[in-house]
Amino acid sequence: MTQQLNVDPAEIKKFEDMASRWWDLEGEFKPLHQINPLRLNYVLENANGLFGKKVLDVGCGGGILAESMAKQGADVVGLDMGKEPLTVARLHALETGTKLEYVQSTAEQHAEENPETYDVVTCMEMLEHVPDPLSVIRSCAKMVKPGGHVFFSTLNRNIKSYLFAIVGAEQLLKLVPKGTHDHNKFIRPSELLKMLDQTALQERGITGLHYNPLTDTYSLGKNVDVNYIVHTTL
């Protein structure tokens, strides 16, 4: 009997259709380009740098974060189930002369073949796009080496996040295409921490990611009402 993959075909198709524009700084993925320096710095600071470390980026898409980590001297593997985003990621890496590897696989499949392999695992803006986020979290815990770091980012589920991420970002400001997110799939920090309790991962810190529409800029802070990042270690 074939094991059912932890993917949502509609989610895969959504990002496949936009894949060619992944590296367009003014396109649908502009917010990802804007927040990437913040995400990268958060990982660098909390993982004590990435140079020479083996890093896995789960749900890498077109490779924005994965490529930036490779440029820090990390040995990076980008993991995604979308064929087109991975094609775009590989082409962009060739164009920029960035050395890293991209693999089409689920986190669960990769974990079976690569237990305790990575010094750092990142899973950014991905948990809210899969049917079973706990399964992904367990896989990340399985793939990181003892003493290693795992980073998760997702969106909180409340009225404010609905107004900011759905009404504001998708409908009014059109920062991302309509239908990019499903508010019902957003994950409260308390829910994410309960999932972590079902693994050996220990939460080390949580920070919010804030958008200022007046300046069109992002920053990190204590408020986790909308976007947030969690740092864990094994």
From Swiss-Prot:
HAMAP family: UbiG. PANTHER family: METHYLTRANSFERASE (PTHR43464), UBIQUINONE BIOSYNTHESIS O-METHYLTRANSFERASE, MITOCHONDRIAL (PTHR43464:SF19). Pathway: Cofactor biosynthesis; ubiquinone biosynthesis. This is Ubiquinone biosynthesis O-methyltransferase. GO terms for molecular function: 2-polyprenyl-6-hydroxyphenol methylase activity; 3-demethylubiquinol 3-O-methyltransferase activity; polyprenyldihydroxybenzoate methyltransferase activity. S-adenosyl-L-methionine binds at residues 39, 59, 80, 124. It catalyses: a 3-demethylubiquinol + S-adenosyl-L-methionine = a ubiquinol + S-adenosyl-L-homocysteine + H(+); a 3-(all-trans-polyprenyl)benzene-1,2-diol + S-adenosyl-L-methionine = a 2-methoxy-6-(all-trans-polyprenyl)phenol + S-adenosyl-L-homocysteine + H(+). O-methyltransferase that catalyzes the 2 O-methylation steps in the ubiquinone biosynthetic pathway. Its EC number is 2.1.1.222, 2.1.1.64. Disulfide bonds: none annotated. It holds the Pfam family Methyltransf_23. Belongs to the methyltransferase superfamily. UbiG/COQ3 family. InterPro entries: SAM-dependent_MTases_sf, UbiG_MeTrfase. Keywords: Methyltransferase, S-adenosyl-L-methionine, Transferase, Ubiquinone biosynthesis. The gene is ubiG. The keyword GTP-binding does not apply.
